[in-house]
From Swiss-Prot:
It is an enzyme of class 2 (transferase). The lineage of its organism: Eukaryota, Metazoa, Ecdysozoa, Arthropoda, Hexapoda. It comes from the Eukaryota. One of its GO terms (biological process) is muscle organ development. This is Protein O-mannosyltransferase 1. CDD domains: beta-trefoil_MIR_POMT1. Its EC number is 2.4.1.109. Gene3D superfamilies: 2.80.10.50. The gene is rt.
Length: 908
């Protein structure tokens, strides 16, 4: 037993030695593994530090079913852990949780994956500890995902470090890892992603084909091409013109046709006149047609930015293609297609801007683009500024929502507010002013519209009034012969003639029977008056000119009849609440003349106290009654030769009481028959045309553009806003002189009526949801409710902002004024169609699922009907096909559509 015990003991000793050797081997292998892990960890950390990463992050790549790790696990720092535990509405990388996930497991959106990473890490550590304490056993390998590029580089660096450590050369490990990190850093990181949206390109091609088909047909002047063509011709010859809308659209077309060789010599005489062979008709209509083609993909993009599904966005673009009114309006030299494109793209960029991170490159680009596009919309037509107002509403609403975000500091909120002011107020103002700067720099010659502007503005232009006033005296003195012009509003000059007021008017009121004083709209010899000091008897300029100053009292003597300007307490003929103004005739009765007028210079802060020709704006106040000489705006009857009435109003502060001297000369007469030479002083004579600053020109032109729109006359095809939604009245654009072929502005009836119904459906659903949610009944998900509100803020409010203001506009309106509102109505229709599909899918389950199929089938049939109506009315959009009278009659679906037949025979 003892020997056996000794043997057993010897065996035990041998076994013990073997175990000790195994432990030593295990210890050495463990130390090697720790060194390898340390080397690999240092390599990866060094690589991350080289790339500028502050915290080590865990990246993953998602697959179709499960997500798998694509990089080795690294220990997280406390800052990383705190970042993980702080929720944020966006990913750590600033992307959206739905579309642009940062694919980072440190992001709070990937918390389930992070849990799986932690559990896998714990399992690996436990398996490593068990392998070190127990006899190693062979275990099957777990399936791992295919390695990414970063994994391959890290595994290669790890293998190199392991080979180094196994050979005992651990120092070289750092050299290899540094070289690998430098190689990875030196590798180019710039990538370009090219993606093509087939829906967008398909819509563009469809719109392009319909807009550019026979673009030069008809080769005649169509509707407002008469006016816009004249303006473009004036741009070619640098001649000043007046238009009630900003000039950007006309500038773009003028720039293009100048490149095409147009010289501006063609005279746009009347609608229907044939273009000359040298007029590039195609290039005249190119930019409107191109903008009309781009409108379809722009609407598609806007609907995508509003979070509609792709099929609904494509439906919106297709409806733009299939609407006849948008087709017609974009094929000729008209401004609406440019206006609609700029407004649509501006709102789309705004919606994307609101989702970008503050200060990022995308944030800056989208915000700047939105500001420029919305400003361009307003610089094409003033209605475009309503889109800018809509943008302001959306920005204010978004800022209001940001106030509830506790994660934003006060500084960040101020940055949000100030940046929006800069992008959506500063940029539009700069663009708008820049457009008019180009306008004034280009149009520096006098033209046919000069008389609308003030004398100072006219004198600043080459030719015209400048050629008359360039050598005339500057200061108004005793003995000056002047013409007094009504400065603001209607252009006319203070005028008198030998005719007198009737003894009694039609309303049985009596008059003074004195000589008439009127305001005449044309140059005439009876517009001349002589300035006279009351205490002097002569009417000549002395050797030392007696300059009239602010506050001086004068008399105005009519140059032809030699009678002085008078007023008294007698009611004016057309404005009884004001005093009559006349030239005094001495009938040898007790009523003496009241001939004294006080000169008040209104802009003396800039022009001085001396009365100057052209630039000084004066008010003439009657000394006896305190009433100011005023243009009343009323027209006299036949006894007054239909000239305009001039009165004296005790309410002195009024724009119509402002006058200025336009033509002026000094004369000295020895007797009343002969005029002597003019007495001119060099220091008082302008040597060149009057200088007017850019800001003075801009302010005056803006004022005139605002007032001029009120004087437009009615048109036989004008319409009222309440007639637009159901298209009660269209517009005849052009009629062929040889047949009944014509161009008539009408929309696609099916689209217009369905879109009007969509407005009512949305308003009804909004009221229904609001009441139900007040009762804590939630018929739609929170996500769908937010989309519903967003569509209302963008499309419903946009429609109302572009439509309701026309009810308060006192001017001639046409159907094409409704097109900006119609586009927003069409956008809202697309959302309503998608929302109804959502409601059916949500609430119709089981046997009711067939209702979804029925709805979609009905939608498809409706779309086919829209295409059929579009094709049916194409002859009225193109005007290229000759139609018989019967064919025209068949297209008259409403009695209010006034189509035109040959020989100007209208359908009644």
């Amino acid at each position: 037993m003892y020997n056996n015990n000794n043997d057993g003991g010897g065996g035990g000793s041998a076994n013990g030695n073997t175990m000790q050797q195994r432990r030593k081997t295990t210890t050495r292998s463990r130390s090697k593994q720790q060194q390898q892990q340390q080397c690999t960890s240092e390599n990866v950390i060094e690589k991350n530090q080289t790339n500028g990463a502050q915290n080590e992050r865990l990246h993953f790549r998602g697959s179709s079913k499960d997500s798998a790790l694509s990089t080795p696990l690294l220990p997280r720092s406390r800052s990383t852990t705190s970042a993980i535990n702080s929720p944020s509405p966006l990913c750590c990388n600033g992307g959206l949780s739905i579309l642009n996930c940062c694919r980072d497991v440190n992001c709070h959106l990937n918390a389930p994956l992070r849990g799986s990473v932690e559990s896998s890490r714990s399992r690996r550590s436990e398996s490593r500890q068990s392998s070190l304490t127990a006899t190693p056993t062979t275990t099957p390998k777990q399936a791992s995902p295919s390695p990414t590029i970063s994994e391959r580089s890290r595994s290669c660096s790890g293998s190199r470090s392991r080979s180094c450590s196994c050979d005992g050369r651990l120092v070289d490990c750092h050299k290899h890892s540094a070289a690998a990190a430098a190689a990875s850093t030196a590798a180019p990181q710039f990538t370009v992603n090219l993606s093509i949206d087939l829906f967008s390109w398909t819509l563009f091609l469809l719109a392009f084909c319909t807009r550019f088909y026979k673009l030069a047909t008809p080769p005649h002047i169509v509707f407002d091409e008469l006016h816009y063509g004249k303006y473009i011709a004036h741009y070619m010859r640098n001649i000043f013109f007046f238009d009630q809308h900003p000039p950007l659209g006309k500038q773009l077309i003028a720039g293009l046709v100048s490149l095409a060789g147009y010289d501006g010599n063609y005279t746009f005489s009347r609608i229907g006149a044939a273009y000359a062979p040298d007029v590039p008709i195609f290039w005249f209509r190119f930019i409107p047609a191109l903008c009309g083609s781009l409108l379809a993909p722009a609407v598609y993009r806007l609907l995508l930015e509003a979070r509609l599904h792709r099929w609904a966005a494509a439906l919106g673009g297709l409806l733009v293609v299939l609407d006849n009114s948008l087709l017609t309006q974009s094929r000729f030299v008209l401004m609406e297609s440019m206006l609609l494109l700029a407004s649509t793209l501006g709102i789309a960029c705004l919606l994307r801007f609101q989702r970008c991170r503050l200060g990022s490159f995308q944030w800056l680009c989208n915000g700047s683009a939105a500001g420029v596009l919305l400003a361009c919309a307003g610089a094409v037509k003033y209605i475009g500024f309503l889109a800018l107002a809509l943008a302001g509403y959306l920005l204010c609403r978004h800022l209001w929502q940001l106030l509830y975000d506790a994660s934003l500091t006060n500084r960040q909120l101020w940055m949000h507010a100030l940046s929006r002011l800069l992008l959506f107020v500063g940029i539009p103002i700069a663009v708008y002013i820049g457009v008019f700067y180009v306008h004034f720099r280009t149009l520096h010659r006098a033209g046919p519209h000069d008389s609308i502007m003030t004398s100072a503005f006219q004198a600043s232009l080459e030719g015209g009034l400048a050629s008359i006033t360039s050598g005339q005296p500057l200061a108004v003195v005793h003995g000056s012969q002047i013409t007094l012009r009504h400065t603001h509003g209607r252009t006319c000059w203070l005028h008198s003639h030998a005719a007198v007021y009737p003894v009694r008017y039609k309303d049985k009121r009596g008059s003074s029977h004195q000589q008439q004083v009127t305001c005449y709209s044309f140059k005439d010899v009876n517009n001349w008056w002589i300035v006279k000091r009351p205490e002097r008897d002569d009417l000549v300029v002395g050797e030392q000119p007696d300059v009239i100053q602010h506050g001086d009292v004068i008399q105005l003597v009519h140059g032809i009849t030699s009678r002085a300007l008078n007023s008294h307490d007698v009611a004016a003929p057309m404005t009884p609440q004001c005093q009559e103004v006349s030239c005094y005739i001495d009938y040898e009765i007790k009523m003496a003349g009241e001939l004294l007028w006080r000169v008040e210079i209104l802009n003396r802060n800039s022009e001085g106290d001396s009365w100057h020709a052209i630039k000084s704006e004066i008010r003439l106040v009657h000394e006896s009654t305190g009433a100011a000489l005023k243009f009343s705006g009323r027209q006299l009857p036949d006894w007054g030769f239909n000239q305009h009435e001039v009165v004296a109003d005790r309410d002195q502060v009024h724009e119509d009481a402002i006058w200025n001297v336009e033509e002026h000369r000094y004369t000295k007469t020895q007797d009343q028959r002969e005029r002597e030479r003019q007495l001119l002083s060099a220091e008082m004579i302008p040597t060149k045309r009057t200088k007017l600053s850019f800001w003075a020109k801009l302010l005056e032109l803006q004022t005139k553009m605002f007032w001029h729109g009120k004087h437009l006359q009615a048109h036989m095809y004008s319409s009222l806003p309440h007639e637009w939604p159901l298209m009660d009245k269209g517009i005849a654009y052009w009629l062929d002189s040889q047949s009944s072929a014509q161009i008539y502005l009408l929309g696609n009836v099916l689209i217009w009526y369905t879109a009007s119904a969509g407005i009512l459906v949305y308003a009804t659903l909004l009221a229904f949801y609001a009441v139900r949610r007040r009762r804590l009944c939630f018929d739609v998900s929170q996500h769908e409710w937010q989309r519903f509100l967003m569509a209302g803020d963008t499309f419903f409010v946009g429609y109302m902002m572009h439509y309701l203001p026309y009810y308060f506009v006192d001017r001639t309106l046409f159907l094409h004024n409704y097109l900006p509102a119609f586009v927003f109505k069409l956008l809202l229709l697309c959302f309503v169609v998608e929302h109804l599909d959502y409601l059916l899918r949500r609430h119709c389950s089981g046997r009711g699922v067939h209702l979804v199929r029925v709805y979609r089938l009905a939608l498809l049939l409706w779309l086919l009907a829209v295409g059929s109506v579009f094709v049916k009315f194409l002859p009225l959009s193109y005007g290229a096909r000759k139609m018989t009278i019967e064919e025209v009659r068949r297209l008259r679906w409403k009695d209010t559509w006034d189509f035109i037949l040959q020989k100007n025979y209208a359908l009644n």
